[in-house]
Swiss-Prot record:
Organism: Schistosoma japonicum (Blood fluke)
Similarity field: Belongs to the GroES chaperonin family.
Name the record gives this protein: 10 kDa heat shock protein, mitochondrial
Gene Ontology terms for molecular function: ATP binding; metal ion binding; protein folding chaperone; protein-folding chaperone binding; unfolded protein binding
CDD domains per the UniProt record, alphabetical: cpn10
Any single Gene Ontology cellular-component annotation: mitochondrial matrix
Length: 102
């Protein structure tokens, strides 16, 4: 995705924009998988995030993920966003289940 598209789209508050990994098209044995057998991809890469949310004291608490982090998502949820013919999903930070350590 080009940087120009991200300048036009900036998540607010604790929202995180992710791009899901591509579903496997072959099994480990090399058999081509039909579309229905692929399953839902629950892993994604963070491509943008908002600044965070304010706490009771009015201080902004930053999000705990950064651009490039690999995260684990719930099976359902998120808002689908299409930017420059590429599909992304927008989640609240609290909806993200886990972050893979580097």
């Amino acid at each position: 995705m080009s940087a120009r598209a991200f300048r036009k789209f900036a998540p607010l508050f604790d929202r995180v924009l992710v791009q899901r990994f591509e579903a496997e098209t072959k099994s480990k044995g090399g058999i081509m998988l039909p579309e229905k057998a692929k399953g839902k991809v629950l892993e994604a890469t963070v491509v943008a995030h908002g600044p965070g949310v304010k706490n009771e004291k009015g201080e902004v608490v930053p999000v705990c993920v950064t651009v490039g982090d690999k995260v684990f998502l719930p099976e359902y949820g998120g808002t689908k966003v299409v930017l420059e013919d590429t599909e992304y999903f927008l989640f609240r930070e609290s909806d993200i289940l886990a972050k893979f350590e580097k």
